[in-house]
Curated annotation (Swiss-Prot):
SS bond partners: none
Stated name of the protein: Annexin A8
Function: This protein is an anticoagulant protein that acts as an indirect inhibitor of the thromboplastin-specific complex, which is involved in the blood coagulation cascade.
Superkingdom as given in the UniProt entry: Eukaryota
Source organism (scientific name): Oryctolagus cuniculus (Rabbit)
Keyword annotations: Annexin, Blood coagulation, Calcium, Calcium/phospholipid-binding, Hemostasis, Metal-binding, Repeat
Taxon lineage: Eukaryota, Metazoa, Chordata, Craniata, Vertebrata
One GO cellular component, as annotated: plasma membrane
Domain topic, free-text comment: A pair of annexin repeats may form one binding site for calcium and phospholipid.
Keyword Protein biosynthesis: no
Similarity annotation: Belongs to the annexin family.
GO aspect biological process, one term: endosomal transport
């Protein structure tokens, strides 16, 4: 399933919210869970992981009206560590959360280029526009300008090009002649010459629709006798290679891409908690069920079982509640 279909898949949602929702008792439950000495973490998990993002915003308003305190700030003061990070992530509206992740990836020394690539390469034109709007509202600066200031070279160019959101095309029309020409141009820009015309790769990967690119990849393999992925690996390196490969992966199958990201976060020693939290939170109301299905096919085990092996305590319980039952 490629990325252009992923946002109409209602069966992919793991967090659907409460059908008989009332923010008043939910806010009261959270207040009692954090009142006095100690915290009832399970009560917090039961409420916040089983409500939709829109419902959580209503709970926050009710909490403020009833108790005069900001719910997110109260949660920050009562919780700690990875569990706090996860619960606080749930309190952000989706686009504001992704704007925050992008801002955090660029603030301070160093840049988390993988986070920026992941978000920009996997979102639709409309989603990117909402993220850019939220970013400017929350941080008082342009996302595009901040990316330009924080990155350089061909990586900067591909990220800015992705922000333009030119890839979306739901009409389904593909011009076979143009697809063949693009494939020939990619071959001429890489495998056929000494060196690489990076801008030709960037232009085609960032401005063509997903359906069109799928046809380009087919034609390219016929011409080059190798996949577009193999050519990218041999012609580029570093963050530019990662960005190009991410575009290709998201074009071929978005759900497989996110399954791979989740596995990458948990494989080996240690856990990349930022990647794990971001992808589970951001996909839970979109297509996490579909991602779970692909995860099991790709790695021979369920996402839930991997979370159980790799995390612990309230953090683990909250993640499992968001992920839901296994397919």
């Amino acid at each position: 399933m490629a990325w252009w279909k992923a946002w109409v898949e209602q069966e992919g949602v793991t967090v659907k919210g409460s059908p008989h929702f009332n923010p008043v008792p939910d806010a009261e439950t959270l207040y009692k869970a954090m009142k006095g000495i100690g915290t009832n973490e399970q009560a917090i998990i039961d409420v916040l992981t089983r409500r939709s993002s829109a419902q959580r915003q209503q709970i926050a308003k009710s909490f403020k009206a009833q108790f005069g305190s900001d719910l997110t700030e109260t949660l920050k003061s009562e919780l700690s560590g990875k569990f706090e990070r996860l619960i606080v992530a749930l309190m952000y509206p989706p686009y504001r959360y992704e704007a925050k992740e992008l801002h955090d990836a660029m603030k301070g020394l160093g840049t988390k280029e993988g986070v920026i690539i992941e978000i920009l390469a996997s979102r639709t034109k409309n989603q990117l526009q909402e993220i850019m709007k939220a970013y400017e509202e929350d941080y008082g600066s342009s996302l595009e300008e901040d990316i330009q200031a924080d990155t350089s070279g061909y990586l900067e160019r591909i990220l800015v090009c992705l922000l333009q959101g030119s890839r979306d095309d739901v009409t389904g029309f593909v011009d076979p002649g143009l697809a063949l020409q693009d494939a020939q141009d990619l071959y001429a820009a890489g495998e056929k010459i000494c060196g690489t015309d990076e801008m030709k790769f960037i232009t085609i990967l960032c401005t063509r629709s997903a359906r069109h690119l799928m046809r380009v990849f087919e034609e390219y393999e016929k011409i080059a006798n190798k996949s577009i992925e193999d050519s990218i690996k041999s012609e580029t390196h570093g963050s530019l290679e990662e960005a190009m490969l991410t575009i290709v992966k998201c074009t071929r199958n978005l759900h497989c891409y996110f399954a791979e990201r989740l596995h990458y976060a948990m494989k080996g020693a240690g856990t990349l908690d930022g990647t794990l939290i971001r992808n589970i939170v951001s996909r839970s109301e979109i297509d996490l069920n579909l991602i779970k299905g692909h995860y099991k096919k790709m790695y021979g085990k369920t996402l839930s079982s991997m979370i159980m092996e790799d995390t612990s305590g309230d953090y683990k319980n909250a993640l499992l509640s968001l992920v839901g039952s296994d397919p």
